[in-house]
Amino acid sequence: MKTIPLLFLLFIYFECDGKFIRHKDESFYECGQLIGYQQYCVDACQAHGSKEKGYCKGMAPFGLPGGCYCPKLPSNRVKMCFGALESKCA
């Protein structure tokens, strides 16, 4: 049972220099199957100031929200692009 927290800590360590942007219409479980989703991720991450190319990444094994992963952004947070936060998304 100690391996799960350790894996989670390693995951947090390696993902701490970016953030996720979730598509406002689709769940992250389906993002790899959507036509044009990879380009959406590239464009959305660029609009949020990412210096590197964004991509679709699921986090279902961790029970966490996922979607577009934007490397090396100034802040570490999950941004949900729907509901009350929709106006804050690119």
UniProtKB/Swiss-Prot annotation:
Q: Name one GO cellular component term.
A: extracellular space
What SUPFAM superfamilies has UniProt attached to this entry?
Scorpion toxin-like
InterPro entries membership: LCN-type_CS_alpha_beta_dom, Scorpion_toxin-like_sf, Scorpion_toxinL/defensin
Q: In which tissues is it expressed?
A: Expressed by the venom gland.
Keywords in alphabetical order, please: Disulfide bond, Ion channel impairing toxin, Neurotoxin, Secreted, Signal, Toxin, Voltage-gated sodium channel impairing toxin
Transmembrane spans: none
Protein name, per record: Phaiodotoxin
- What are the top taxonomic ranks of the organism? Eukaryota, Metazoa, Ecdysozoa, Arthropoda, Chelicerata
